[in-house]
């Protein structure tokens, strides 16, 4: 019995002594992967905010489309149209075209008559921008274009500006959701 306790004690001591070594081995990781190229980094951000806007467009109950927090604010529908249409302030100049919308288009001008039309419009705007970023690649994203400002702007900088603009309006939509007692899709528990 005494030998058994001694053997068990030694085994326990060896096991405990080995834990730090095992933990260090587990902590050793693969070296970090190289940073993504500029176009990949822009595309990841573009798609991330686009995914959030699409999720809201798909999730938002149609009876809330005309909600606005105060009379001077845009409605849910107007914010989604504004943020989506504004993506062409990147997409069009990046292709050396004039932006197709000089101001916020009206739902009737876009033939947006219902939720399905609005969801399709948001998806198209996001996809068109993603397609331009992919087509431009790293070299093309470093080209400069005339986007209507006082100086030329690098295409990647224009994309980052639109990503930021989209994120700001996503924040507006989150507040609209919360004001209506709803939880935005991105804030819900993951299943």
Model-flagged regions — what are they?
Residues 28-38, 97-111:
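Acidic/histidine-rich, surface-exposed loop or edge segments in extracytoplasmic proteins
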Residues 43-47, 54, 64-106, 146-191:
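Short, contiguous alpha-helical
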Residues 60-61:
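Membrane-proximal, proline-rich intrinsically disordered regions
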Residues 52, 56-57, 91, 128, ...:
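Well-ordered alpha-helical scaffold segments within catalytic/enzyme domains
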Residues 45, 110-146, 154-168:
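Acidic/histidine-rich alpha-helical segments that form the ligand environment
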Residues 1-11:
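Bacterial N-terminal signal peptides that target proteins for export
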Residues 21-25:
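Boundary at the C-terminal end of the N-terminal hydrophobic targeting segment
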Residues 9-20:
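Bacterial N-terminal signal peptides
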């Amino acid at each position: 019995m005494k030998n058994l306790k001694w053997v068990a004690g030694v085994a326990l001591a060896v096991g405990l002594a080995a834990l730090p070594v095992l933990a260090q081995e587990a902590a050793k990781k693969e070296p970090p992967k190289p940073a993504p190229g500029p176009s990949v980094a822009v595309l990841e951000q573009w798609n991330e905010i686009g995914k959030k806007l699409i999720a809201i467009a798909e999730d938002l109950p149609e009876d809330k489309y005309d909600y606005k927090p105060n009379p001077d604010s845009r409605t849910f529908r107007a914010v989604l149209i504004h943020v989506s249409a504004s993506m062409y302030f990147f997409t069009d100049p990046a292709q050396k075209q004039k932006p197709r919308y000089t101001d916020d288009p009206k739902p009737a001008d876009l033939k947006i008559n219902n939720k399905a039309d609005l969801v399709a419009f948001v998806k198209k705007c996001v996809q068109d921008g993603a397609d331009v970023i992919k087509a431009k690649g790293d070299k093309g994203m470093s080209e400069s274009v005339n986007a209507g400002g006082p100086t030329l702007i690098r295409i990647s900088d224009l994309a980052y500006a639109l990503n930021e603009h989209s994120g700001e309006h996503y924040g507006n939509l989150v507040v609209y959701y919360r004001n209506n007692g709803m939880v935005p899709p991105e804030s819900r528990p993951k299943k």
